[in-house]
Amino acid sequence: MNMIRITDAGVQPFETEHIGLVRKTAPECALFLKREDETLPVAAGKVALYGSGARKTIKGGTGSGDVNVRHYVTIEEGMENAGFEITSKAWMDAYDNVVAEAHKTFVERVKKEAAELGINAVMYGMGKAMPEPEYELPLDAEGDLAVYV
């Protein structure tokens, strides 16, 4: 195996080659759902998109199951690229704010607990997971379709 040192932040030739291979082989890996009454595929239109996975789409595993990439397409971005109009952007923005505030509070709490115990905050925080925040946001977007991810 040849290892190379990348000193240029630009897209490398091997990355372009790999992206091409993924685009070529991805259709062979698609999962098709049971189709009844011509319900799938859904025609592009207005969609109310909700859920943490809409913008924070999970693209792989964790640890060795994760893949470092420059960019990956989120559910929101993919639906927009397919011609859908996302009508719930205000909800997603509000949800992002709720999560950001919850994360800030979580980090402050972990740092405080570590200080009280006399433990390094980084070490104390390892393995701790922020719980999903509780929130009440109106589900008031309109559309031809609603999707929760």
Regions found by a protein language model. Give the residues of each.
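C-terminal non-catalytic regions of proteins with extracellular/luminal or membrane-system context
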Residues: 1-149
